[in-house]
Amino acid sequence: MTEHKRRATPPYHQDPDVTALESLPARQQQVLQATVHHYVDTIEPVGSKTLVQRFGLKASAATVRSAMGALEQRGLLTQPHTSAGRVPSPQGYRHYVDCLLPPPGSAAQHLERELTNLSLRWAALDDLMWQLARRLTDFTGLMSLITRPARPKPTLQAVRLVRSGDRLLVMLVESSNQASHLNLRLPHEASNELEAIEEWTRDQLATTGNGSLDWSSLPPQLNLSGSLLREAIHSHSQAQTPAESDAVFHGMSRLLAQPEFSSSASLQPLLELMDTQPAAVVPVGSEQLGGVWIGAEHPKSALEACSVVQAPYHSSGEGIGQVALVGPMRMAYATAKAAVSSVANHLERLLC
């Protein structure tokens, strides 16, 4: 599946799916939760007898087996081999995270105390990010990533064009209440198109509502001025993009040691992403939100075998940064969510 076809809407900022929870019988909820916990702990498919014995389920093995079959029909469990037990599917993990996640427990409180006792008040931001990333990896056993605070990228709200001889002054009005000025050479052939191209941009921005221009709908008679304007806006946008070096990550070796990443075919795209675009772990458009991406929910195909748990932190006057954990879909989600939230809150207290 190509990346541009992947789901772009963050799946995790919505309220828990109450309808799905109510439609899943209590027995199946209990069995799904137990199956997830067993698989996270053991990396082994599980059968009904083991679930009854280990988790003290008040039901016979036959009843639990029936519930597991129903969960498999719903797509929440899967059976890797005919003779094997069952494991959670990506959809099963999603339902678990949305509806069945337990409290994080005492481990998260231990991390809070540990962070409070760290002497980081006067540390430089780079040192602060590195130390907290290492602590996060040591605590969870997952790869951690922390990005520098950055203001949300402004969106385009209006385009104004002013001709001055053979030059064209382009004023870009952005959502940050700032205006950028671009000075371009104006071909003589395009001088009569300015009023029409400005009107076209105005209509486009009103239609899309998100600061984007659909250049594929540009009338053919405006191609000359449109090409000039498109290139100028693109160059300006690229210049505003934060550098990828504004992210630090730690614990790649922990991630690669997981059985899910024993195949080089699944490993190479992930290594390339972390080498060239580590900040892409946090999907564009989710900067102010916190939550969980599971498998193919993430817009980057390199992370389709992973889960990403993230939490934002705010820095006074600097914008928004991110704390994230990357691991296999088989992870302790309650602990991971509590851990990124603790580190994000600690960063806010230190930076504000």
Swiss-Prot record:
Molecular function as annotated in GO: DNA binding
UniProt entry tagged with the keyword Transcription regulation: yes
Pfam families per the UniProt record, alphabetical: HrcA
Keywords (A to Z) from UniProt: Repressor, Stress response, Transcription, Transcription regulation
GO biological process, one term: negative regulation of DNA-templated transcription
SUPFAM superfamilies: GAF domain-like (SSF55781), Winged helix' DNA-binding domain (SSF46785)
Function: Negative regulator of class I heat shock genes (grpE-dnaK-dnaJ and groELS operons). Prevents heat-shock induction of these operons.
Family named by the database record: Belongs to the HrcA family.
UniProt name for this protein: Heat-inducible transcription repressor HrcA
Natural source organism: Prochlorococcus marinus (strain MIT 9313)
Taxonomic lineage from the root: Bacteria, Bacillati, Cyanobacteriota, Cyanophyceae, Synechococcales
